[in-house]
Amino acid sequence: MGPALPRRPDMTDHRIWDPFLRLFHWSLAILFLANAIFTDPDETLHEWVGYAIAALIALRLVWGLIGPRSARFASFMPSSNSIRAQLTDMAAARKSAHLGHSPLGALMIFNLIATLIGISATGYMMTTNAFWGIKWVEEMHEVLVTWAEISVVAHIAAVFWESRRSGINLPRAMLTGVKRVPDTVRLDP
């Protein structure tokens, strides 16, 4: 969590997302989209894009341990109380926000990382002699890809819904690294 930037009327800017995290996020989005829509699963390009995704996930895991505070997993590990508080605020239409990841956002991050690890592992397994042509590996890969696609759609919908609810342009924050928070929004830890 960086220092607040100069104030604008009714808004306060906070530097949150570091360049690596933003580059990771958008690179992962592009590569996932490429493999889901544009590459043929039987082609070498699909395999190499999958390796690139696996490498990005490995880097993110390291960055989650050694990166700046807002990137560290320990800084946004959700508790049942924080999840309940966020859901209560949402149900009561209270404007609140988190400078870093919200508890529900953190759950989605962990879900996507775990799912992409599973996709990468099963994808790699399908390239080996030991698992080539084994039906359960292929089926698990397909199930995980479908789950990832559902999760990505839910993530995008939640980002736009939360942006509208809180008045914070979350896509802009992930592009610039700066969250512009309305002064009327309560910031939760």
Protein language model regions, located:
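Membrane-embedded alpha-helical bundles that constitute the cytochrome b-like, heme-associated redox core
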Residues: 1-189
